[in-house]
Amino acid sequence: MLTLENLSFGVQDEKSQKEIIRNLNLTIESNKFVVVTGPNGGGKSTLAKMIAGIEMPTGGRSLLDGADITEKNITERAQSGISYAFQQPVRFKGIEVFDLLRLASGKELNITDACQYLSEVGLCAKDYIKREVNDSLSGGELKRIEIATVLARGTKLSIFDEPEAGIDLWSFQNLIAVFERMRQNIKNGSILIISHQERILDIADEIVVIANGQISMQGPKDDILPHLLGTASAVDACTKFYNKEEA
């Protein structure tokens, strides 16, 4: 379980301190698929980077399973059980997919397990296990290989920052299928995704909306999603709310 207490992050400009995240409180329970959304510039990616240890908070505390990780950097947080997937996955010329999976796992990984991780993200294992992680791979392929490394690592909290960025529609559809499988098979850990995409929001157990550096809405998907979308469900939610107020 991840707990954020009064977490803040600010940067100094020429005149004053600009607050990007302000006294934010958030708990992510174990075995939950949580999506963070909100307007551009609201602080979503900054929050993800603070949780991963890429950015250090200017105030507040971060706890993982009760242990204070506030001062830990990205390497120390990875060792504690937090993984972070970048918007644009890194390419490694000269390194094969199997080598990358073995490095990510942090242990001796056999070929059968490596092929299983690739299969779980919708890749034909025999076609990819010996491929180099280089420019010959598409953005969608790289995203799925990166997710396979997260599975191999077996972390307590897996963070994906706008995983849909830079991939085509076909790759996005495959990505959705991967996340749906991850949601169905989630155990001994949680998934946190930063996204605007309705199809990713629809997979969530919980949705957190961040605007102006603070949480504006938070709750189960079925409670929050209708407020975010101009759909029939939103109209129905509005009607029920109005009728309740009039009763």
What are these regions (language model features)?
Residues 2, 19-23:
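Conserved structural motif at the start of ABC-family nucleotide-binding domains
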Residues 37-39:
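The feature captures the beta-strand-to-loop junction immediately N-terminal to the Walker
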Residues 60-68, 113:
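Conserved ABC transporter NBD signature motif
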Residues 88, 94-110:
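Q-loop/switch helix immediately C-terminal to the Walker
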Residues 159-163, 170:
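Walker B catalytic motif
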